[in-house]
C-alpha cells in the first residue's frame, strides 16, 4: 500500500519507462481499493493501474464514495455533496499521478463497479477532456451528479463500455439500460452488454471488457 496520492491507493506501475496509459479503479459501496485491484494481474502490463480507496469509512468495515440514506418509508437518496467531494478528490489523484508515475495525460481510463461506476460515468461526462475510455460495471447515470452538458465535440474522443447483470438485485437493470440512450444522445461511442448474473462481474464480462480495453489503449 502506498499513500502519495490524496486517497489511499494500491498501484501497479507500468513496464513502460514514460508516458504510460493509466487505468484508475473505483470500487463499489462497502468495499475497498483491493477489490478491483484483483483484475490488475490479468490486464496489459503497459498500463499503470491505480486503485483508489473511497474517503468515507463505513461501520464495521468498508468504504463509500458517498452516503446512501433511507427514510422511514425506505425511500433512498444519495448524498450529492459527498459525491461531488469524492469526484474532486479523484480528479486530484488523476492529476497527481502524472508527475508521480510519469503517465500519459492523454490516455487515462476509468473502471468503476456499482457506486464506482456511477462516479466514473459522471467524471467522464463532467470532465471529458481528461479521459479516454470508461468501463462502467453494474451502475447507471445519476443525473444529480452531472454538470450541464457540453457541446458534442467535447465528447467525440470518449469510449464507453457498460455492462450489467440481468438479475441485479441492487441496481435494477432497467436503470442501466438508460445509460446507452443517454450516451448516444450526446454522440458518445459506447458498447452495452448484459450478463445472466446478479450484482457482480461474470467471467465472460471480465474477458469482454478486457479485450475492449486492449483494443483502445
State the predicted function of each range.
Residues 53, 111, 137-138, 195:
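Alpha/beta-hydrolase-fold catalytic nucleophile elbow
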Amino acid at each position: 500500500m502506498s499513500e502519495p496520492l490524496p486517497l489511499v491507493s494500491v498501484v501497479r506501475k507500468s513496464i513502460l519507462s514514460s508516458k504510460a496509459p493509466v487505468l484508475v479503479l473505483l470500487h463499489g459501496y462497502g468495499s475497498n481499493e483491493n477489490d478491483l485491484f484483483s483484475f490488475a494481474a490479468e490486464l496489459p502490463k503497459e498500463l499503470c493501474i491505480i486503485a483508489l480507496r473511497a474517503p468515507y469509512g463505513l461501520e464495521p468495515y468498508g468504504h463509500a464514495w458517498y452516503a446512501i440514506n433511507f427514510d422511514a418509508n425506505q425511500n433512498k437518496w444519495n448524498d450529492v455533496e459527498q459525491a461531488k467531494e469524492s469526484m474532486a478528490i479523484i480528479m486530484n489523484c488523476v492529476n497527481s499521478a502524472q508527475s508521480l508515475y510519469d503517465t500519459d495525460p492523454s490516455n487515462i481510463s476509468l473502471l468503476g463497479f456499482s457506486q464506482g461506476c456511477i462516479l466514473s460515468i459522471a467524471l467522464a461526462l463532467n470532465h471529458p477532456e481528461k479521459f479516454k475510455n470508461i468501463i462502467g460495471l453494474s451502475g447507471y447515470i445519476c443525473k444529480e451528479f452531472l454538470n450541464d452538458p457540453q457541446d458534442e465535440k467535447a465528447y467525440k474522443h470518449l469510449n464507453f463500455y457498460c455492462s450489467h447483470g440481468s438479475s441485479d438485485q441492487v441496481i435494477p437493470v432497467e436503470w442501466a439500460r438508460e445509460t446507452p440512450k443517454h450516451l448516444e444522445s450526446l454522440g458518445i461511442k459506447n458498447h452495452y452488454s448484459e450478463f445472466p448474473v446478479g450484482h457482480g462481474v461474470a467471467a465472460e464480462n471480465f474477458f469482454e471488457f478486457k479485450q475492449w480495453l486492449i483494443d483502445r489503449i
